[in-house]
């Protein structure tokens, strides 16, 4: 606890008022134990300091003498300070202000600690009990100083008592610590004895460890040398058995394992070449080079022997070994290509010999039980009566060869499912390449045989049947073969060329027929007075249309769009052109225009009747319908002219058309007023025309039917009669209106309805008249 020294001997002046201070008495009391502990520490330090000083001073001086001297000096200093204080009492107000400030600082340090009000109240209550006379405490003289010192002593006495009670609480702990002191001393003694023994044993152990370390180093060195020797033997040497396996052992999994090891040793020898003396590496490399080369030769011989005798692959073990050989050789393309070339040559010669023997009928030679040969019960015989069967049998045989070779090569070069996908793709390419090279050897022979048949055949039906067979087998071959543009003798390309040859042959035959017909005199002489189509067109379509009808593709024989259009033009338009040329050149017959039109109509009608059921010719049907319409219109105009001339109205018809041609959409009588200026337009001529009309029209229908009797199509005849009669009646009606307008006493004898009845078109005319316009 902090105490206040307020020794002042001034009586007249009172200190200046100061702000209220909080006195943290309780907190100082609580911290008193800590202060005592600090005091104890200070005392220990002083004692240690004194002990050090005792070493320096002489041994005759005692500690009590030094302490007495020190406290005497402190007392003298205190007296001197008191004298100085008495002198300072007479100083100015500034010094009193400093004293007051010092007092305030002390009070603030003591009272500013935060404490509960109840604790402050209790502290001051206890302090009040100690204070007997407050006036004596605040006196500035000696009496006040003694009173304050007395109060201080009482407070300190209470604090000492309080601290003593607190120290009593630690007495059991101190007692226990005293008991532990003896045990600790015993333990320290045991520790010292054990430490001494350990130190003695440490030296002996140290010597033993040194000896063990030397032995371990020696052992490690020996193990290292042993490991190096074993590693060298494993990496750079083969045992006797492994050398025997490579040189004389059976080719199997063990053989390839040893061979792989041998190759690794050969590769690792490059390390030995980098040492100072490379002779050892060179010797090892030379030895293993010989072993590897001999092993490769054994693998090549085994592979060639196995591939030449495919019947030896009847076991899974043999096939697996062959796959391992091929996989090993695949890494050495020069050896692999040599093996494949030998195999391809052998198989190619075999299938060519078998093919020729089948064609030539020599079954004894083809049945010599060679590996992978295809046996047939009968030869393929070319028959002049049935070339389609010959080509069918030939293509069937080729297809069986293709399937057999594909399956054989796939079984030989196919890999197991355990292989990865990259190897699968790689071997698939090899299978396709080998199969194609073997089968391509047949391309020349097959092409020559089939082209020989195609070239010698002249029947369209036969050529088309051959085309269908070749086209069918092209699709079948495409499933097993790949087309290669680099190989000119690719079998699939050869078959496609045969398809083109058959297409060209069909087109060539048709062109030759048309050329022959065009230049044939007999074809021109077939034009006669019955106006019927010539026989050559019937024969022409009897050969061509059946094969077109058999076609199922979008274009004929899968021709391109342009070629298909040219072909259709050749079989439809070209005959029409030839027929028209025949009509124009046939002057001896002296066909009039009507007969020529009827001939053309009958010709087109025949073509339409032939091609109508064929869907592939639907575009040409529309084109022929347009031509028929044009010819029908021309014949209708001729028939109209015949009716007008029969009624002797041709001059009037020409005059009216010169003024303004008739139209169904518009008619005005006033437009034709200039006709009155013509001398022919008179009452006498109209009366004469009536007489002729009266005699001609009753039998005109029979005359028309008789003139169209040679037209083959009843529909065309009916349309021509109806249209020509309607046109005549329209002219008759309009001409009668003109007469009525400009000739007062003249008129045609019959009305338009009566004329329509005479011509047999009353009902159609009634419907047509409704759409006519008269102004």
From Swiss-Prot:
InterPro entries: COG6, COG6_C, COG6_N. It comes from Debaryomyces hansenii (strain ATCC 36239 / CBS 767 / BCRC 21394 / JCM 1990 / NBRC 0083 / IGC 2968). Coiled coil: none annotated. Acts as a component of the peripheral membrane COG complex that is involved in intra-Golgi protein trafficking. COG is located at the cis-Golgi, and regulates tethering of retrograde intra-Golgi vesicles and possibly a number of other membrane trafficking events. This is Conserved oligomeric Golgi complex subunit 6. The keyword Membrane applies. It is a peripheral membrane protein. Pfam families: COG6_C (PF20653), COG6_N (PF06419). It comes from the Eukaryota. Keywords: Golgi apparatus, Membrane, Protein transport, Transport. It is found in: Golgi apparatus membrane. GO terms for biological process: intra-Golgi vesicle-mediated transport; protein transport. One of its GO terms (cellular component) is Golgi membrane. Belongs to the COG6 family.
